[in-house]
């Protein structure tokens, strides 16, 4: 029976697991999107979302609490200066998990985990697809185009051969 087994240990000791989650959280904050297994992504989501919530109020105490979990100055400043400003009006759900299939070597289920407000690539492709779509037929599209102006003809005389 699975009593009192609240979280996934990920096959690691407690110190290894906390170090791995801290490093993955720093990578997620720096790069905004990382590729990992689904189990690690779910554990990372539980780890990083309270830190993002804590970063919304920029106080000395909240910075110390976040730094004790991340241990990376660059990640902490990035979190408090850029990410917290972008997610200030969002009440939670700062990360998204997108499953990408199975890994070739061991068939592990892989996914992307990304910050929700930093998905510029997905937003650009969605608008690009809408812009290129048209319902006009080719015949009517060709008729509406202006006919090309006739090109000025220039004739060059070849030098006379003797």
From Swiss-Prot:
* Gene Ontology molecular functions: structural constituent of ribosome
**Is the keyword DNA-binding assigned to this protein?**
no
What does the UniProt keyword field contain? Ribonucleoprotein, Ribosomal protein
Q: Quote the biased-composition stretches of kind Low complexity, using this chain's numbering.
A: 140-153
Report the superkingdom from the record. Answer: Bacteria
Q: Name one GO cellular component term.
A: cytosolic large ribosomal subunit
Q: What is an annotated GO biological process for this record, any one?
A: translation
Q: What Gene3D superfamilies does the record point to?
A: Ribosomal protein L17 (3.90.1030.10)
The region called Disordered is annotated at 126-162
Cross-referenced InterPro entries: Ribosomal_bL17, Ribosomal_bL17_CS, Ribosomal_bL17_sf
Record-annotated disulphide pairs: none
Give the Basic residues compositional bias ranges. 130-139
UniProt record similarity statement: Belongs to the bacterial ribosomal protein bL17 family.
Mind telling me which NCBIfam families this protein's record contains? L17
Cited PANTHER family: LARGE RIBOSOMAL SUBUNIT PROTEIN BL17M, RIBOSOMAL PROTEIN L17
Q: How does it assemble?
A: Part of the 50S ribosomal subunit. Contacts protein L32.
Q: What is the protein name given in its UniProt record?
A: Large ribosomal subunit protein bL17
Q: What's the source species for this entry?
A: Phocaeicola vulgatus (strain ATCC 8482 / DSM 1447 / JCM 5826 / CCUG 4940 / NBRC 14291 / NCTC 11154) (Bacteroides vulgatus)
Encoded by which gene? rplQ
